[in-house]
UniProtKB/Swiss-Prot annotation:
It is found in: Cytoplasm. GO terms for cellular component: cytosol. Catalyzes the condensation of the acetyl group of acetyl-CoA with 3-methyl-2-oxobutanoate (2-ketoisovalerate) to form 3-carboxy-3-hydroxy-4-methylpentanoate (2-isopropylmalate). Complements an E.coli deletion. The lineage of its organism: Bacteria, Pseudomonadati, Pseudomonadota, Betaproteobacteria, Neisseriales. This is 2-isopropylmalate synthase. GO terms for biological process: L-leucine biosynthetic process.
Amino acid sequence: MTQTNRVIIFDTTLRDGEQSPGAAMTKEEKIRVARQLEKLGVDIIEAGFAAASPGDFEAVNAIAKTITKSTVCSLSRAIERDIRQAGEAVAPAPKKRIHTFIATSPIHMEYKLKMKPKQVIEAAVKAVKIAREYTDDVEFSCEDALRSEIDFLAEICGAVIEAGATTINIPDTVGYSIPYKTEEFFRELIAKTPNGGKVVWSAHCHNDLGLAVANSLAALKGGARQVECTVNGLGERAGNASVEEIVMALKVRHDLFGLETGIDTTQIVPSSKLVSTITGYPVQPNKAIVGANAFSHESGIHQDGVLKHRETYEIMSAESVGWATNRLSLGKLSGRNAFKTKLADLGIELESEEALNAAFARFKELADKKREIFDEDLHALVSDEMGSMNAESYKFISQKISTETGEEPRADIVFSIKGEEKRASATGSGPVDAIFKAIESVAQSGAALQIYSVNAVTQGTESQGETSVRLARGNRVVNGQGADTDVLVATAKAYLSALSKLEFSAAKPKAQGSGTI
């Protein structure tokens, strides 16, 4: 492929991002994220690892049936059954890709694969040829490429290009590289690889040294024209390269890179909020682009400069990345059509009239408690309602909390398990402890609480509380979320949400070795 100034954005939030502890998503949640990614304008959506479990296959297949503009991709090991499952999963998509990989570093080949270099090349070529039976768009990844020998990489990349690979991905699997080395590595590898100019070269950088974005940009300087990234930099260990940071770096410093993307940057913040809400991973306030403080100025000198001319201290506008200037949304007199229109403006799509009616009913309840409804309220409300509808195993109905100074708080809670109403009571060292003990007295999940957190959705004492609960049982870790103006109600909802996800994840065991790149 000839050098171009167009950068392909490959989003792997639904695959590599979901491998963050507790970030597992239901099929319905993945579809919501995929729709938002398409609205964001990403070129490729890596929808999952189809062979990992029946649940993963179902989610990839559902996304393939839903997405029409972006290419839908499934990851697969260089194993025939994996590749065929990936091909079947993405088959309904108008634009489809299979992404297959094998490790290429000496340490991985010797200790993990227990294969000789020649055997690795043969497996890679076979994998690409099988993938080409399903689609002309085949990506091949050299796992742990940045710790691989460059001459061997050139050999294996040349072989898979001849076999039909159209994109070659070079992952920094353990976040080991530094930017100037990354640029040199890409430049040398592309030059050494037979037919290296006929394919798209891709970078997939992990953030173990905090350099994922810098390394991705360096790879582009070295000749890559695809970057693999996630919303909010979500990913296992220290995370992946952040899509919002890469895109805005290319846009703001167009003078240095001269590169373009197809991203609608006004959808960056809505995408960030959706992924954060669904996964339960909050965005740190000082996170570039999407953090709450990203466009805040405390210094009097800075404030004065910004008031006189924004560009004195801002290199991009808040509006350009999707921060709304007027966040006041709706009130108690707002009707259903206004509510529906506002959701559309926020990029929130509900799948059915039933879902819209349920969300509108929740909105009316909230409007009776809260005078001003902001965009953030609607995001939290809809996510909470959708979570309740989709995770049917455990559902909150009502609760009563009794507290008195010097006495143990008591929680009386009513909830349902698969439609069957349950009642439970318990005392605890505090109201939260009492709620969890009451639920567990019936659920008997055996899960351990790892994290409990509450965040105010907006400012003011009337704000909704958005609660996150992380539960662990065995090797399964899940996050549950709940939102309500009563933080104790939100707490119960979050715990029940986590239990539902725990049951869901237990029903879809992962394939052994389904790993990462």
